[in-house]
């Protein structure tokens, strides 16, 4: 009787043979001696057992598993053999240095290509600006062909191999990525793998009954099955449609977690996995460095569950990861999981998503601004921040999406806070329905049956810049100081660095009027960017402040890595934490001066250099921070 390890080894050898069977004996002999085959075979030896185990856990009883694997690995070999030499060099470099993403040099930016630059050629022209800001990572949103009109901001993909014609061509994208690499900037794109648009060829052929695409999506003849699923599903966009299904013109029902034009893929069909792996490898060979794995929580469906965060979803992502380790190991995954904090962290791991959005820290930064109290933020940094080795948070202040209050009710309850009541307060505060609020946000997806609501708005609008609040500029700098210094990869939603306000015209566009997130998706404001070096303007003060902090971070190895230790300031308005036993960070979330007492600082050295202020401060006496002031103190 063979052991499981021996069985996997035999399958691996069989599949290697099958990959080469399509070649003539002479071709095969040459391939087997090639460096490409040596590297590919080595990576198969290392990562195929993981791939096999993950797929077996999902599809073990499906007779299509082995033939699917055979086609998948043949596809992976073709992809690797066609990968250009510079990308293969990056593959090896990142295999040898998996912590490249944790360097203090890393600073990210994210933008809509059309809104920021018009098209891909316009974006290429802005590379000198990205270098000026200090970016080493650029997330380009959204790039691919999508339906005209409503498309969830481009996240309803009609083809993963065609750029939206308004932006350019695949050739243009390849040129932009090469130019970014030349400038020392990694390219990040979205991998929207939970769903496609209803106009995707697969969707059209599945709906038409093409046997090659049978069961690529969840299509039901009537409401019997959808009604059973809906009993346990969470409504994501209740304004768009109740439940998780939409009716087709012929009366059938299709699974649409998000919008009626976004059809969920059916991963219980192993050929869907193989098809999406092919799209993933195509993107890798364009030169993409990081794939933002969209909507990771939703990819597996199971009756009687919420169909979120199921074990099979994790297994499938790990299987995609294993394919990438074999055929394009330079490419990392970034998780997008806006779920309970316990579940967010489960997607992050060297074998799953090496980096992941940090929605808890983002939400708690805004919470701390509203309450002026650091208790929830301090708790999260203490117990929920540190990640496994070789992984990192993507720390952000704003994004293209709404703000959801994703802290755990049990965490809030431990501090004597009602999670439900506190979320109601935060929603009222940030949409200016609370006395004394400085924010000018917009409600998003209010659900009257649950009371749930999220918030739209740019950082500048949410900190009070629209009404010239005297503390608005310092609030933005404070928030970004946390993102830049807590450990991991900081991400700037481009426009924030010059204080871009909401687009108040979003509701006048019929393709956007039912989605308030367009409020914080304004076009590039040329006038604001022209002011970025003028310290008499808010744009200049924000830009120069952020640029200074970025330069400090990138020049100082104390910001390397991702781990921290919280420091109790004994002041409810001041957050404190230590990085690498060498840097003590403080941030005052109050509009009044606040003090850390000498007694609290007694274990610290007598003096420390403030990297932001450029001054030496005494730590053997009370330390006062001005309203919204940040200090990064060298203590070793």
Curated annotation (Swiss-Prot):
Record text on activity regulation: Amylosucrase favors hydrolysis at low sucrose concentrations, and polymerization at high sucrose concentrations. Competitively inhibited by fructose.
Subcellular location, principal: secreted
Protein localization: Secreted
Residues carrying the site annotation Transition state stabilizer: 452
EC number: 2.4.1.4
Phenotypic consequence of residue 352 to Q: 30% reduction of activity
Single GO biological process annotation from the record: carbohydrate metabolic process
Pfam families, alphabetized: Alpha-amylase, Amylosucrase_C-like
Keywords associated with the record: Glycosyltransferase, Secreted, Transferase
Domain of life: Bacteria
SUPFAM superfamilies per the UniProt record, alphabetical: (Trans)glycosidases, Glycosyl hydrolase domain
Any GO CC annotation of this UniProt entry: extracellular region
Gene3D superfamilies registered for this protein in UniProt: 1.10.1740.10, Glycosidases, Golgi alpha-mannosidase II, Oligo-1,6-glucosidase, Domain 2
GO molecular function, one term: amylosucrase activity
Catalytic center residues: 294 (nucleophile), 336 (proton donor)
Catalytic activity: [(1->4)-alpha-D-glucosyl](n) + sucrose = [(1->4)-alpha-D-glucosyl](n+1) + D-fructose
Misc. remarks from the entry: Like the recombinant protein expressed in E.coli, the amylosucrase may be secreted in N.polysaccharea without cleavage of a signal sequence.
Family that this chain belongs to: Belongs to the glycosyl hydrolase 13 family.
Function: Catalyzes the synthesis of alpha-glucan from sucrose. Catalyzes, in addition, sucrose hydrolysis, maltose and maltotriose synthesis by successive transfers of the glucosyl moiety of sucrose onto the released glucose, and finally turanose and trehalulose synthesis, these two sucrose isomers being obtained by glucosyl transfer onto fructose.
Subunit field text: Monomer.
Full protein name: Amylosucrase
Species of the source: Neisseria polysaccharea
């Amino acid at each position: 009787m063979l052991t499981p390890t021996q069985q996997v080894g035999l399958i691996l050898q069989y599949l290697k043979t099958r990959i080469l069977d399509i070649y003539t004996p002479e071709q095969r002999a040459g391939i087997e001696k090639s460096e490409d085959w040596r590297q590919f075979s080595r990576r198969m030896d290392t990562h195929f057992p993981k791939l096999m185990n993950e797929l077996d856990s999902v599809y073990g009883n499906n007779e299509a598993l082995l033939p699917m694997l055979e086609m998948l690995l043949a596809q992976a070999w073709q992809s690797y053999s066609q990968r250009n030499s510079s990308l293969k060099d990056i593959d090896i470099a990142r295999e040898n240095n998996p912590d490249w993403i944790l360097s203090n040099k890393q600073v990210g930016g994210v933008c809509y290509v059309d809104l920021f630059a018009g098209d891909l050629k316009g974006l290429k022209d802005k590379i000198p600006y990205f270098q000026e800001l200090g970016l080493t990572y650029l997330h380009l949103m959204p790039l691919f062909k999508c339906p005209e009109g409503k498309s969830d901001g481009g996240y309803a993909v009609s083809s993963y191999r065609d750029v939206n014609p308004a932006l350019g061509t695949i050739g243009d994208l390849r040129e932009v990525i090469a130019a970014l690499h030349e400038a020392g900037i990694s390219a990040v794109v979205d991998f929207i793998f939970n769903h496609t648009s209803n106009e995707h060829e697969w969707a059209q052929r599945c709906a038409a009954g093409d046997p090659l695409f049978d069961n690529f999506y969840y299509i039901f003849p009537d409401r019997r099955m959808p009604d059973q699923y809906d009993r346990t599903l969470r409504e994501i966009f209740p304004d768009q449609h109740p439940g998780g299904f939409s009716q087709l013109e012929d009366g059938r029902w299709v699974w649409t977690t998000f919008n009626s034009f976004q059809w969920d893929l059916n991963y219980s069909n192993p050929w869907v996995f193989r098809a999406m792996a092919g799209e993933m490898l195509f993107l890798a060979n364009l030169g993409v460095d990081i794939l933002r794995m969209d909507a990771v929580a939703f990819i597996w469906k199971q009756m009687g569950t919420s169909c979120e965060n199921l074990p099979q979803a994790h297994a499938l992502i790990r299987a995609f990861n294993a394919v990438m380790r074999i055929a394009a190991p330079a490419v990392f995954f970034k998780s997008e999981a806006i779920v309970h904090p316990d579940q967010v962290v489960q997607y992050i791991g060297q074998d799953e998503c090496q980096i992941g959005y940090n929605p808890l820290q983002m939400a708690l930064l805004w919470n701390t601004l509203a309450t002026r109290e650091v208790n929830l933020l301090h708790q999260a940094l203490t117990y929920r921040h540190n990640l496994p080795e070789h992984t990192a948070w993507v720390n952000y202040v704003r994004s293209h999406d709404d703000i959801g209050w994703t802290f755990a009710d049990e965490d809030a309850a431990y501090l004597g806070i009602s999670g439900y009541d506190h979320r109601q307060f935060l929603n009222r505060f940030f949409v200016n329905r609370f006395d004394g609020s400085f924010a000018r946000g917009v409600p998003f997806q209010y659900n009257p049956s649950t009371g749930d609501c999220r918030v739209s708005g740019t950082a500048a609008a949410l900190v009070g810049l629209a009404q010239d609040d005297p503390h608005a500029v310092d609030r933005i700098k404070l928030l970004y100081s946390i993102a830049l210094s807590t450990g991991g990869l900081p991400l700037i939603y481009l426009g924030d660095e010059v204080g871009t306000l909401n687009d108040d015209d979003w509701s006048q566009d019929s393709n956007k009027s039912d989605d308030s997130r367009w409020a914080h998706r304004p076009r590039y404001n040329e006038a604001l960017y022209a002011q970025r070096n003028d310290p008499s303007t808010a744009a200049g003060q924000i830009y120069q402040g952020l640029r200074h902090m970025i330069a400090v971070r990138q020049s100082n190895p104390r910001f390397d890595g991702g781990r921290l230790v919280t420091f109790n300031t004994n002041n409810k308005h001041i957050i404190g934490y230590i990085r690498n036993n060498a840097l003590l960070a403080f941030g005052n979330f109050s509009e009044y001066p606040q003090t850390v007492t000498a007694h609290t600082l007694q274990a610290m050295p007598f003096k420390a250099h403030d990297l932001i202020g450029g001054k030496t401060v005494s730590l053997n006496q009370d330390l006062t921070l001005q309203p919204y002031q940040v200090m990064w103190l060298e203590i070793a």
